[in-house]
Amino acid sequence: MADYSYETTVDVRLRDIDFMGHVNNATYATYLEQAREAYFRDVLDVSLTETNTVLVSLELEYASPIEADDAVTVALRVPELGDSSLPMEYEIRANGERAAMARTVQVLADPDSDGSQPLPSEWRRRIERRK
């Protein structure tokens, strides 16, 4: 498994399951969002809902299905930082085995314009320390 600096567990809910008994493909993006929320809380010490981050990119590659009774974890890392962008790479695991790989890019939006704003220096420090 690749080296990821953060990991969190997610619960498979009944509503996540499709007619084939697998976690629905769209739910994987929800698991990524839950991992981002946990990362912001645990690493950056801020609630994701209190930031002006906007998801601008999502890439998701499925490797194997997740079943209703699987233990699911999401590992993530920040490969590099942009001026205002925060890319994240993920591995969703079911019972320790890769179920999907993903990448997202969040941008810190400037609420006073249609543009972006630089990532806070405190975020940069915490992210670099976590690597």
Locate the predicted segments by residue.
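HotDog/MaoC-like acyl-thioester-processing domains
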Residues: 3-4, 62, 67-68, 79-131
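A generic structural signal for short beta-strands and their flanking turns/coil linkers
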Residues: 4-8, 36, 49, 54-58, ...
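Hot-dog-fold acyl-thioester-processing enzymes
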Residues: 2-57, 111-131
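Short histidine-centered beta-strand/loop micro-motifs
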Residues: 19-22, 64-65, 70
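Preference for bulky hydrophobic residues occupying beta-strand positions
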Residues: 8-12, 30, 60, 76, ...
